[in-house]
């Protein structure tokens, strides 16, 4: 474990717990809000679960024993992060698409990827197509064998070498597949969630730290990703995503949310002025229409809710690990 990781662990241990809620002003959350956001994530996406097997000597007293961390297991990664070109790499490769493919960087330095989910979907489809092609070859061989047997053309069978060639094709495809267990814990020093990755190869053998780094965007390897012992288990090496920027990013999102809320209020005020000019019958019709959309308006006026924190957290953390397909949260909000 590096010096940076040791200092980070020490800081986590020494930082006092703050139970006050200041999510709206700072983008940070309290332990109670972390549990609330975790409950919402588990409710919306059952692939995430609260971990209840944390050793007692590693448990944090300010969290419930059965809600020490969140975990989702066996999440696939079909390609390494280097296969996902950044905006810098794409420039010049196809000049006509440079403007469309550029990635926006927010004022805190985090990347807002426009195309990242499309790339992941395309890659996943590509892997599926490759698998289908191989299955088609197997079906083709089986069908030919049956036809030859029924037609009594002969007992010709594929040589062992030919089967070996097919095994090599399958092995090559499977060797690219990795699976990750993802853990979300509460960081006392930064008062935000913290993500840990534990990876395995296609045979279920644990990945070395440097191998896990291959699934992390090169822009973040030296900035936000570090090798640490998993804090909720013994003798488990992981790669953590440093949470130093998380609250800052959330503050930016909160700012945008407030701006949207202000625009919504101005729109409602304008609508009220228009209603005052309507006739009685027109007002009745308009009131019925407003009642139908009332729930949606109330939701928008609330802006970003604290129980949505982990949903948003997973969205902007996806730019760090572009190939790991754990962001199932696109339609949650």
Curated annotation (Swiss-Prot):
Region annotated Disordered sits at 81-112, 278-300
Q: At the top level of its lineage, which domain of life is listed? A: Eukaryota
Report the locations given in the UniProt record. Cytoplasm
Note whether NADP occurs among the keywords: no
* Pfam families in the record: Autophagy_act_C (PF03987)
GO cellular component terms, alphabetically, are: cytosol; mitochondrion; phagophore; phagophore assembly site
Specify residue ranges for compositional bias: Acidic residues: 95-108
Region feature (Flexible region): 84-174
- MF GO annotations: Atg8-family conjugating enzyme activity; Atg8-family ligase activity
The record's annotation in InterPro entries points to: Atg3/Atg10 (IPR007135)
What's an example Gene Ontology biological process for this entry? protein targeting to membrane
Key words of the record: Autophagy, Cytoplasm, Protein transport, Transport, Ubl conjugation pathway
Q: Where is this region: Handle region?
A: 248-308
Active site: residue positions: 244
Bias type Basic and acidic residues, positions: 278-290
Q: What binding partners and quaternary form does the record give?
A: Monomer. Interacts with ATG8 through an intermediate thioester bond through the C-terminal Gly of ATG8. Also interacts with the 40 amino acid C-terminal region of the E1-like ATG7 enzyme. Also interacts with the ATG12-ATG5 conjugate.
Q: Which PANTHER family match?
A: UBIQUITIN-LIKE-CONJUGATING ENZYME ATG3
Free-text comment about domains: The N-terminal region is involved in phosphatidylethanolamine-binding and is required for ATG8-PE conjugation.
**What's this chain's function?**
E2 conjugating enzyme required for the cytoplasm to vacuole transport (Cvt) and autophagy. Required for selective autophagic degradation of the nucleus (nucleophagy) as well as for mitophagy which contributes to regulate mitochondrial quantity and quality by eliminating the mitochondria to a basal level to fulfill cellular energy requirements and preventing excess ROS production. Responsible for the E2-like covalent binding of phosphatidylethanolamine to the C-terminal Gly of ATG8.
Spell out the family assignment given in the record's similarity comment: Belongs to the ATG3 family.
| Protein name according to UniProt | Autophagy-related protein 3
